[in-house]
């Protein structure tokens, strides 16, 4: 099976979409697929092209058997909304043009921004091939959830376009059951929806002793470390976390933030203004280095802003943390909270509730029996959400449906 996969993010970028796409495609190649990735020059989240790459019309490379074609796009930091829209639109157009010359049996496009799916839909019409909408986020609802834009004519148009693309997709693969329920409630045929969640890469992430060199380098020996590794974006509510840290007088607790994003500078400035001593900010690290830094963490902090839309998401940090037996302090409601509580893999606090967060931190630090029970829960969670197993499920689902779709698909778009 020849797969054309269109994605805005791909390694060496190391956010959740890039990681999932790479790991899935890598597994599909082992199952006999020929995969071509259509993406842009790596630049997330700073909007700066990574060393060794250029923002050219076409770039070709091979990454562990995956054919990667990079096309030009308007590049900007993950900050201002209108500039990001230009980024998305330019990549949609460039990927469409490049896709015209790539042979495939099926076309897959992944969100969260769905302009990649416009490219996939257009290619499917012209090339008469089935296409899959991989749904990572309910966009544009998530735009409003972080106050990037208020409801108006633009959001109405985006909502119409979103629903149109769901209906036109041959298959929709959402990452959560909540996404599936949302689609069904909006009239999308349940029979063409298959949930494939994110999962744990058990080959990269596994339980291990704390990395003593990293502890020494950061001068954090003997500290109870609460770690956040990932995007410092508008959705994560890290300003709330920093404000809460300023009210914690336990000097043995230390907070470690690793990553970058639209809010990174703001929360660093906030911590300096408040003269917080028990906090460390580090620049982004490559994916292969994450396990070493995660090893020194006692608690994995996973917050999001308080919003109904975030009740539908499952942060990928859950699966990396569970694979390394790191109990989680989760500030997310909805399906993510259900998973953590069902597996007893962490403690949940109400998003943006300072007193609840502080209380749960103390509980995790001082209740050793609870901590060990949560570690056992992490092991069970990671085993059930094995990334390889989920990648194979997705490939099998696509394979089983593609031949039938080829026979019956008649485009009337």
Question: What is the meaning of each model-derived region?
Answer:
Residues 236, 286-293, 298-322, 329-338:
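Nucleotide-sugar-dependent
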Residues 1-64, 248, 410-413:
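N-terminal subdomain of nucleotide-sugar transferases
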Residues 4, 220-236, 241-245, 256, ...:
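Conserved donor-binding/catalytic core segment of Leloir-type glycosyltransferases
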Residues 356, 363, 370-384, 396:
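A short, well-ordered alpha-helix in the C-terminal region of glycosyltransferases
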Residues 178, 199:
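Carbohydrate-associated surface elements
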Residues 93-103, 115-118, 122-126, 152-174:
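Membrane-proximal helix-turn-helix segments that form the acceptor-binding/catalytic region
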Residues 250-252, 258, 265-292:
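Nucleotide-activated donor-binding/catalytic signature segment of Leloir-type glycosyltransferases, i.e.
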